[in-house]
Structures are given as C-alpha cells and as structure tokens.
Amino acid sequence: MKKGLKVFLGAAIVLSAVACSTSNDEVKKETKEKVVETKEDTSVPKEYRNALHKAENYSKMMHMSKQRIYDQLTSKYGDQFDVEAAQYAIDNLNADYNENALKCGENYKKTMHMSKARIYDQLTSESGEKFTAEQAQYAIDNIKGDYLEAALKSAKNYQETMSMSKDAIYDQLTSEYGEKFTAEEAQYAIDNLDE
C-alpha cells in the first residue's frame, strides 16, 4: 500500500510539474529580468532558510499554489521539513499566486488541451493544484485564446488513440465527468475532425 501511494504521489507531482512548470527559455528570461541580490539572514535557522529557498523554487519554476508548496515542503515523500520551517517559508515567500495559477492554467490548456471548466477544477482540486477559487478564477479570466482548438485537439486525440465514434467523442467532450467543453466547443471539434 505504501509503495502504491508513493508511486501515485510521485506521478501526481510529475504531472503537475510537467503541466505547470516553466520552459528553460522562460526561466532564463525571468532570471535575467529578476536579478535581485538577497542578503541571507543568519539569525534565521539554516533549516528555515533552506525551506524558503525550496519554496521560492517551487513558486518560480513550477508555479505551485501556497498549499501545494507547504504540502511538498512537509511531505514525507517530498522535502520532509518540519511544519515550523515550512510555515516560515510560506510566511516569507514573496509569490504572486494569481500569476502562478495563470501560468499553470495556460500550461494545462497548451499541453493537455483542457476546457475552461477542467482547468478550473484542476487548479482548485485537493488532489490537483490546490489554488484558491479566486486564484483559479483569475487564471480562467486571463488565459488567452479560445477553447475551440483545445476541444478539437482533444477530440483528435480520442479519435486517434481510442478509435471512438464522433457521437462518443462529443459525449466525452461535453460530459460533466469528462472534458467539460461547452456544446459549441464540442460541436466545433466534431465538425472539424478528419473523416
């Protein structure tokens, strides 16, 4: 059971890292733009400073929510910091969680072709990104582009990898338990699938 849980948690972290992480080019660009000298406060225990450093990396590189950063810092399958060090990191982390949610949401749309509703669900899910409702809504309101192409790419994936009929694809695209695209987005996808 413990091994299965480790594998599940590891897979969840990898999925989130892939979906929400920044490309190397973006990191290089952001690093050049944000060169800031920080003086390390030696009155703060090294363990606390290490937790803060890890938290900064999770925020800047993986665009994690406050709760996911805390969970990763304290997880026995993660960084294993004590709760005091993790709380210090959270309290002293200078992060824009709206922007983290936005970058994470943009990556879900771009790489996984998710609908607005699925992105929102993933961003707020307790087994997903754990952003607040307000942060997730900020992301949804600011993700650029329409969702017609995302629906089409998702439909093509179902057609090619699962050999589904157009009716089954439409149902999957619009299902509350599936992709959660709007009827208009799903119909666009069906109308533009290869024959």
Language-model regions: role of each:
Residues M1-F8:
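Bacterial N-terminal signal peptides that target proteins for export
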Residues L9, I13-L15, A19-H53:
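N-terminal, intrinsically disordered, polar/charged segments of Gram-positive cell-envelope systems
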Residues V36-E195:
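An alpha-helical, amphipathic repeat domain used for nucleic-acid recognition
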